[in-house]
A protein has these predicted regions:
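Non-catalytic helical/linker scaffolds that mediate oligomerization, partner binding
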Residues: 1-476
């Protein structure tokens, strides 16, 4: 069997002050990190560029293949600054939101979206800091929005604003986001997590911009965190490379009790479409302060894996928490334990029901998955140039690892989020005989012993995107 039992569920870690030095990055990679997330809601290009450079150095030093995700700020609304860095709201207090650039207080403060007064109506709620403070709109006077605080609460500078039930008219791609995406193209990031995607066109706008900047192959993962995004999920999945279920803002925009249902629905839809899905936000939130998670957090991570998520994500836990390494190790242990108990036969049957078996490449991958289950093979070795074969295999969730040899370092990184896939950089082969010989070498390097069986699959050497053969091989 494979020498180290491989974690199939991938882990995304947000990197910040608690984790951005070289030694801590090495620890996080050893603990199970697959993708580094850079949150462009905070920090500048110098800081993010430094993180990316350090990760590349670490990858080179220790032979890891951790990919880079750029997470956009998105068309979010934030408060301005407050005198003293924070303000205290009192229930029943009148609070005025103004487009004027001021250093504010609970009585009067500014926000980043200057035309909110055009969109809101009396009776709407404006939620501040993930809903910690609720402001009920009383009336709009000129460009000022007069509200009444529904509860007490403290709010620090530049906290997020949500306006559930109100359709906001701002442009999806701000100048900041455009510049950030161009920076990401220059930095060769592998994934873009696009915040507050509301419709299909938002995804297409990002894809157009990155293509114009010479990087059409960067994978775009819309974050579903508002009502419109949920309503338009089918058309968004159609054009996306994957989805992130961003439960923080989503849980403010919709009733909290709806979030688990939405999470399950989106994961199911992505699984059926063969698209990556990441479950994110507050998964191990208490580990920002504590070395061990709550039992509820363990169950949350476990249930996302049972639901079929490809990846699970850490935010503040790894970016600014006291225990970033412990948080990754905790996720890793949960993933291993749950993966041991998955009903792989049932998952395979469900995947086959939703597969396009009129497609020859899909039919071969389906056959590989069925043979792997029936013969209890030790691994699937899926040779791939673009990653297409390995991605197809991933949707069938085989019990054994999918080892994906590829001559492309870019493909290695882009497979970092696919469930069960272990990408391996290898030399290019032009013949089937050469591929089979290489499969033997790769199998042994991954701890598969003589006498064990693997399935070798892939496309015609030199032809991208197709899966055209499978062969059961006994390791010699």
């Amino acid at each position: 069997m494979v020498k180290e039992k491989m974690k199939k569920t991938k882990i995304v870690c947000t990197i910040g002050p608690a984790s951005q030095d070289k030694e801590m990055l090495k620890k996080l990679i050893k603990a199970g990190m697959n993708v580094m997330r850079c949150n462009f809601s905070h920090g500048d290009y110098e800081e993010h560029g430094m993180k990316m450079d350090i990760l590349r150095e670490v990858n080179k030093e220790i032979g890891s293949d951790v990919a880079i995700m750029l997470d956009t700020k998105g068309p979010e609304i934030r408060t301005g600054a407050f005198e003293g860095g924070f303000t205290e709201f009192k229930k029943g207090q009148v609070s005025v939101i103004t487009p004027e650039e001021i250093v504010g207080s609970a009585d009067r403060f500014t926000i980043s979206y200057k035309e909110l007064y055009k969109d809101v109506k009396p009776g709407a709620y404006i939620l501040v800091n993930d809903g910690q403070v609720a402001l009920l709109v009383d009336h709009v006077e000129g460009q000022d929005i007069y509200c009444v605080a529904a509860n007490d609460g403290r709010v620090k500078n530049t906290r997020g604003i949500n306006v559930p039930g109100t359709k906001l008219q701002f442009e999806f791609l701000s100048e900041k986001d455009k510049n950030d995406l161009i920076f990401g193209c220059k930095q060769d990031v592998n994934f873009i997590a696009a915040s507050f995607v509301r419709r299909k066109q938002d995804v297409l706008d990002i894809k157009k911009l990155i293509a114009e900047n010479g990087k059409p192959d960067i994978k775009v993962l819309p974050k579903i965190e508002c009502v419109e995004g949920v309503e338009n999920i089918d058309e968004i999945i159609e054009v996306a490379d994957g989805i992130m279920v961003a439960r923080g803002d989503l849980g403010v925009e919709v009733p909290a009790e709806d979030v688990p249902l939405i999470q399950k629905s989106i994961i199911k839809k992505c699984n059926a479409a063969g698209k990556i899905v990441i479950t994110a936000t507050q998964m191990l939130e208490s580990m920002q302060e504590n070395p061990r998670p709550t039992r509820a957090e363990v169950s949350d991570v476990a249930n996302a894996i049972y639901d079929g998520t490809d990846a699970i994500m850490l935010s503040g836990e790894s970016a600014q928490g006291k225990y970033p390494e412990e948080a990754v190790l905790t996720m890793n242990k949960i993933a291993h334990k749950i993966e041991e108990s998955l009903d792989y036969a049932s998952i395979l049957r469900r995947a086959i029901r939703t597969a396009d078996n009129s497609n020859s490449s899909e039919a071969i991958c389906m056959s590989v998955a069925e043979i792997a289950a029936n013969f209890n093979v030790s691994a699937i070795i899926a040779f791939t140039e673009t990653g297409a074969t390995a991605k197809r295999m991933s949707r069938y969730r085989p019990h054994c690892p999918i080892i994906a040899p590829t001559p492309s370092d870019d493909t290695v990184k882009k497979l970092a989020l696919n469930w069960g896939v272990k990408p391996v950089l290898c030399k290019s082969m032009k013949s089937r005989e050469g591929l089979m010989d290489l499969a033997m070498v790769i199998a042994k390097e991954n701890g598969i012993s003589a006498g064990e069986q693997v399935i070798v699959t892939g496309g015609t050497p030199g032809v991208s995107g197709l899966t055209s053969y499978l062969e059961i091989v006994t390791i010699k």
